[in-house]
Amino acid sequence: MPPKKGGDGPKQPPLIGRFGTSLKIGIVGLPNVGKSTFFNVLTKSQAAAENFPFCTIDPNESRVPIPDERFDFLCQYHKPASKVPAFLNVVDIAGLVKGAHAGQGLGNAFLSNIFACDAIFHMTRAFEDEDIIHVEGCVDPVRDIEIIHEELRMKDEEMIGPIIDKLEKTAVRGGDKKLKPEYDIMCKVKSWVVDEKKHVRYYHEWNDKEIEVLNKHLFLTSKPMIYLVNLSEKDYIRKKNKWLVKIKEWVDAHDPGALVIPLSGGFESKYQDMSDEEKQKYCEENKTQSILTKIIKSGYSALQLEYFFTAGPDEVRAWTVRKGTKAPQAAGKIHTDFEKGFIMAEVMKFTDFKEEGSENAAKAAGKYRQQGRNYIVEDGDIIFFKFNTPNQPKKK
């Protein structure tokens, strides 16, 4: 069957942010809200989780494997010599405080660490504990969210002024017509962030040209954000906390579409130390379960990443690509020669492979398809690439 021709497929929405696959998500919040405890559980590492502000000064970074039943199934089926899952790069960033944009606390260093990330786990505290001081004196997660939001917005406001001044000098007073569109776009960004006091990502109607300009500057408020609400173990198990509704209302009003995920660092830490039998018994008795898998997958998705599989007896591997990646560029993740000499991608959907029971059965059922260079790779595709080897240099 020849590769399908067709068009370029559905138009993908433009993506705000760094282009690439080695992207990071940072854990951000006020001091003593549970960031390092969460990071420790997430990465099974032992970053210092001390009860005082700024105990995490150098960001701790870790690669967290993405839990995936499809990957596990392929490994069980092929029993490969090598297994390589996809990973989420997570950074534990020290607590921000009010005034961080102006250098309060260790503000400038922490904000630069957030600049280096591509999405944010925004952690807020909704548990009371006399032994764990709160930097603001009392627990109020909505206030805490607003503090972090305002610090990020104020830092962007500081950046926007000089950018517009420079563009005004060259595009308006200097008459450089090529830069005039960028100047106009930055004025729109200024109106939104400085005058309306909103985050870049709140506005969902940025067009391609505007996103091109936003991606030159990578503003803090353009980064996707997932809200993690840290509860006590008791509240997490009973699925009740007086702050949850208020937090959801705030997020729906200010950051519509953003995820709010309740968790309990205390529960997850305890759960991680249990044996499999103890975990099962505890979860059945308390009608609860770990939320880590959902958080990890949500973080990966927030970075606009997905992965395809190559699978066989030598290796089962998940290859990370940006959403909307076409087959030749996906092939290039394996080796540049695969992209240069791309002929076609032979693609099976994981569900078809599992349902039919083997590659040959999937072929016989017409579910093993040959796709051309316009094919947009989908999450969980199992792909075999065909390519021409580039000509070797001729010997003299």
Curated annotation (Swiss-Prot):
The keyword Ubl conjugation does not apply. Residues 304-387 form the TGS domain. GO terms for cellular component: cytoplasm; nucleolus. Its cofactor is Mg(2+). Keywords: ATP-binding, Cytoplasm, Hydrolase, Magnesium, Metal-binding, Nucleotide-binding, Nucleus. GO terms for molecular function: ATP binding; ATP hydrolysis activity; GTP binding; metal ion binding; ribosomal large subunit binding. PROSITE patterns: G_OBG (PS51710), TGS (PS51880). Signal peptide: none annotated. NCBIfam families: redox-regulated ATPase YchF. Hydrolyzes ATP, and can also hydrolyze GTP with lower efficiency. Has lower affinity for GTP. This is Obg-like ATPase 1. It comes from Danio rerio (Zebrafish). The lineage of its organism: Eukaryota, Metazoa, Chordata, Craniata, Vertebrata.
